[in-house]
Amino acid sequence: MKTSLLRRTIIVSLLAVVSLFFLYFLTTGSSAPVHAQPSEKLEMTGNITNQAAAEACLAVLKENLQAASDQDATAYAATLVAAARAETTQELAAFFAEEQLQHTLLSFEVVKQETESMLVAAQQKTISPKDSSYRDHITEAYHTFVKEADGWKIQETVMTNTEFL
């Protein structure tokens, strides 16, 4: 009786290990991840309840990334909430002196949209055109936009899921 129970326990354990092993290889396959390709007309996706507001936030994000690519700290700061502009401009001046990067928006998905705020998940590609220690990558960025007196502005950005190229 004990032998039979021991045999079943070993078989069940082996099946569990084999299943975990199979699941691991199934989820970490060697296929390359698929990334959206940049285009002139980027398609907005997600929970869009106000098309005009979503388009305004998309325009702000494009301006933000273009200003970063152009190393224009003033234009970059203009896309941020008023409270963050002065400090960010000073920090960017030092960063722009060391690195020249090109930023490309690959996708724009509205996660949550309210009258005065919007959460957007965007896929962004950042590359260094010159030989530098900066690592080219694609990242998912969660941008929180808020509506201020002068329009939609970026309040916060959280970067996640960075894949180095």
What kind of region is each of these model predictions?
Residues 70, 74-75, 94, 130-132, ...:
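Mature, folded catalytic cores of secreted/periplasmic enzymes
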Residues 5, 115-165:
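Exposed beta-sheet edge and beta->alpha loop/turn motif
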Residues 59, 73-121:
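Short solvent-exposed beta->alpha transition segments
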Residues 19-23, 28, 113, 123-128:
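Charge-rich, low-complexity terminal tails
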Residues 61-64, 92, 99, 103, ...:
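Polar/charged side chains located within well-ordered beta-strands of beta-rich proteins
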Residues 4, 10-14, 20-70, 78:
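Short, low-complexity N-terminal intrinsically disordered segments enriched in polar/charged residues
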Residues 53, 60, 88-89, 138:
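Amphipathic coiled-coil/heptad-repeat helices and related helical stalk/stem segments
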